[in-house]
Design a protein with these regions (language model features):
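Basic/polar, cationic surfaces and motifs that engage anionic cell-wall
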Residues: 1-328, 364-458
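Glycine/small-residue-rich phosphate/adenosyl-binding loop
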Residues: 358
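A generic structural signal for well-ordered alpha-helical segments enriched in polar/charged residues
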Residues: 346, 350, 417-420
C-alpha cells in the first residue's frame, strides 16, 4: 500500500466486529478466545481505576495482528481507543437495531472468561465487589451519579440515545442531546457485557460464536427474535435494582482504597455514597430494565413530519390500542419492523394525506417499540380523541390470532406502567380498543378480547 491510499474501513456494524473476532480467534492464525479481550485492553478499553483494579494494568500498546487487514485494524483502534469524554465513539450498530459500546462489552467478556478459568484468575476485591458488574456498569454508574450530584443542576447522569448517519452503512453516530458519562450505547454495552460475561463464567466459548448467537447477524435477516432483544429482562434477572445498589456501594468502596483516591470521591461520606447508589440503581433500572427500548424515528428511516406538529399536554387520560392490519404478519427483526414503519408512514402520508404516521408508537414482535409521533406530538389514530390519549399500534392482523405472549407483555407490563411512571399518562388511565371509539374492527377480535382483562380497560 502506498502512503497515499487509505485503507477501506469497514462500517461500524456488529458484523464488522464479528469478522475481526473470527480472524483474531482463529486457532489456525494463533488466536484463542482470550485474544480479543487482551487486545482490547492494550488499546484502552479498561482505562478507569476500578476496571484496572479488577482486570489489571493494560499491557503495552499492541501492534496490528497479521490476521487483520489495515482497514479492520483502523476500525478496531478507533472503536477502542477513543477520548473517555466521548464514549459513544466506541459504539457499533447491532443487527437488532441497538447501538452497543464495545468497551464495557469486551470488559465483561474478559471478566467472564477469567472467572470461568481462562487466563489469570481475577483478584478478590476488598470490600467484596462483583468483578463482572464492576468492569461493566457499577463503577460507571457510581462515577456518573457522583459527578452529576456535585456538578451544575442540569448535569445528566444517564443517556441520551442517538442516530446513525446511515443504518445500511453506519459510520457516524451522533447523540441527540447533552452527553453524560453513561449514554445509551454504554448502558447497552454494559448490560450485554454482564449477560455474556455471566454466560462465559460457566465455561469458555469462542467469543465470535457467542456474539453471533446473541446478536444474530445482518440487518435484514428474517430469522426470529435474537437473544440480544431480551437484554433488559436478562440483565434485570442478574442485577436487579437492589443488587445494583449494593454493588455500586461496594465498587465505590474499592475505589476509596486506591491511591490516589479518585478526585470525585475525596470528600464523600458513607451516607452520601449510599444515597448516590440508591439514586443510580433506581434511575438505571427504571430507564433500562423496566421500561421498553424505543427505536427513534431516525433509526427506522422516518420521513419528516409535513408541516408543524401540534403538541400534546401530558399527562393524558387514555391509551388506544390498534392493530396495523397491513402488514398482516408480525415483524420479528429490526430490518422487517423498520420496513413496516416506512410502509405505514408512506400509506398514512401519501394515501390518507396525513402529516405523518398516525400512531404515537408502534410495537414490533422483535422486542422493541418504534417511535411514531411519540410522547409529544398529537397523533392521527383515534378520530375525535387524538388529543386525549396515545395511540399504540401492534404490527400485524389480530382478527383471528394474538400477538405472541412476549409482545403482549411488552405493552401490558412494560409500556403502560412506564407511561404512568414517566408522567405521560395518569395513574388512573383508561385503555380502549379502537373499535370502542369508531366504526372499525380494529384492533381485531382476538386482540380486543385479550385486552379486556388488562389493567385500565373500560
Amino acid at each position: 500500500l502506498s502512503p497515499a491510499v487509505s485503507p477501506t474501513v469497514p462500517p461500524r456494524h456488529m458484523d464488522s466486529v464479528l469478522d475481526i473476532l473470527d480472524a483474531l480467534e482463529s486457532p489456525a492464525r494463533g488466536g484463542s478466545p482470550g485474544t480479543a479481550a487482551a487486545l482490547g485492553r492494550g488499546l484502552g478499553i479498561c482505562s478507569t481505576p476500578g476496571c484496572q483494579a479488577v482486570l489489571g494494568q493494560p499491557p503495552g500498546t499492541p501492534k496490528r495482528p497479521p490476521a487483520l487487514t489495515l482497514g479492520q485494524w483502523q476500525l478496531l483502534t478507533e472503536l477502542l481507543r477513543h477520548d473517555p469524554a466521548t464514549p459513544e465513539m466506541g459504539a457499533v450498530l447491532a443487527p437488532d437495531g441497538s447501538t452497543v459500546a464495545l468497551g464495557p462489552l469486551l470488559a465483561g467478556i474478559e471478566a467472564g472468561l477469567r472467572s470461568g478459568g481462562l487466563g489469570r484468575p481475577l483478584p478478590t476485591l476488598d470490600p467484596p465487589a462483583d468483578p463482572l458488574l464492576a468492569v461493566t456498569i457499577t463503577e460507571a454508574l457510581g462515577t456518573s451519579f457522583l459527578l452529576a450530584q456535585g456538578g451544575d443542576n442540569n448535569a445528566t447522569a444517564l443517556g441520551p440515545g442517538g442516530c446513525w448517519d446511515d443504518v445500511e452503512n453506519p459510520q457516524n453516530y451522533t447523540l441527540r442531546g447533552p452527553p453524560s458519562p453513561v449514554p445509551d450505547p454504554v448502558a447497552i454495552g454494559a448490560m450485554d457485557g454482564v449477560v455474556l460475561g455471566a454466560r462465559l463464567a460457566r465455561g469458555p466459548l469462542p467469543v465470535a460464536e457467542l456474539l453471533r448467537g446473541y446478536y444474530g447477524t445482518g440487518n435484514g435477516s428474517e430469522a426470529g427474535r435474537p437473544p440480544s432483544s431480551y437484554r433488559r429482562r436478562d440483565f434485570g434477572a442478574l442485577a436487579g435494582q437492589g443488587r445494583l445498589e449494593k454493588e455500586v456501594v461496594a465498587v465505590l468502596g474499592v475505589l476509596r482504597t486506591l491511591s490516589p483516591i479518585p478526585e470525585f470521591l475525596r470528600d464523600v461520606g458513607t451516607q452520601e455514597v449510599a444515597a448516590v447508589a440508591r439514586w443510580a440503581a433506581r434511575e438505571f433500572s427504571e430507564r433500562y430494565v423496566e421500561c421498553p427500548a424505543i427505536m427513534p424515528r431516525c433509526l427506522w428511516g422516518a420521513r419528516p413530519y409535513r408541516g408543524t406538529p401540534a403538541l400534546l399536554r401530558p399527562p393524558l387520560g387514555s391509551v388506544f390500542l390498534h392493530h396495523t392490519l397491513e402488514p398482516a404478519q408480525p415483524c420479528q427483526t429490526f430490518g422487517a419492523c423498520a420496513r413496516a414503519m416506512r410502509d405505514i408512514q408512506r400509506f398514512h402520508q401519501d394515501t390518507r394525506g396525513w402529516d405523518d404516521i398516525g400512531y404515537s408508537f408502534v410495537v414490533g414482535s422483535d422486542g422493541y417499540l418504534y417511535e411514531g409521533r411519540g410522547w409529544h406530538w398529537v397523533g392521527a389514530h383515534t378520530k375525535g380523541y387524538n388529543t386525549q390519549g396515545f395511540g399504540v399500534g401492534i404490527v400485524g392482523d389480530f382478527t383471528a390470532t394474538l400477538p405472541d405472549p412476549d409482545t403482549l407483555a411488552l405493552v401490558r407490563d412494560e409500556l403502560l406502567p412506564c407511561a404512568v411512571r414517566s408522567g405521560h399518562v395518569w395513574p388512573d388511565f383508561t385503555l380502549h380498543g379502537h373499535r370502542q371509539l369508531g366504526h372499525t374492527d380494529c384492533p381485531g377480535n382476538a386482540l380486543f378480547q385479550e385486552i379486556q382483562s388488562w389493567p385500565g380497560f373500560q
